[in-house]
Amino acid sequence: MRHKNGYRKLGRTSSHRAALLKNLTIAIVKNGKIETTLEKAKELRSYVEKLITRARKGDFNAHKFVFAALQDKEATNMLVNEVAPKFATKNGGYTRIIKTRTRRGDAAEMAYIELINE
């Protein structure tokens, strides 16, 4: 059965959603921590953790896979060469979501999503 195997649509078309996740991933790789809405953070966690798991191998194919997803040389090199080796012995759980506040304009729940430093 495939119940509950969906994803959050985030009120966007599929191409807009893909671009959003790509841009948020680049931001979290470069900065280590970003603030976004809670729903975006939860969806981003799944996307980022799959990329980090793939990047842990560090071989040519890992570079190719990550670059295909991010299309940013700087972020790809940071992810494969700096971020992923930190998690070489860890199986999943590379990110942390911390709820912060409700946004004043639309009362959306905000949260920080960050890479865990170990």
Curated annotation (Swiss-Prot):
Gene: rplQ
Source organism per UniProt: Campylobacter hominis (strain ATCC BAA-381 / DSM 21671 / CCUG 45161 / LMG 19568 / NCTC 13146 / CH001A)
Subunit structure of this chain's protein: Part of the 50S ribosomal subunit. Contacts protein L32.
Protein family: Belongs to the bacterial ribosomal protein bL17 family.
Keyword Protease belongs to the record: no
Single biological process term from Gene Ontology: translation
CC per GO annotation: cytosolic large ribosomal subunit
A Pfam short name: Ribosomal_L17
GO molecular function: structural constituent of ribosome
Origin organism lineage: Bacteria, Pseudomonadati, Campylobacterota, Epsilonproteobacteria, Campylobacterales
Keywords noted in UniProt: Ribonucleoprotein, Ribosomal protein
Alphabetical list of InterPro entries matching this protein: Ribosomal_bL17 (IPR000456), Ribosomal_bL17_CS (IPR047859), Ribosomal_bL17_sf (IPR036373)
Taxonomy, superkingdom: Bacteria
Protein name: Large ribosomal subunit protein bL17
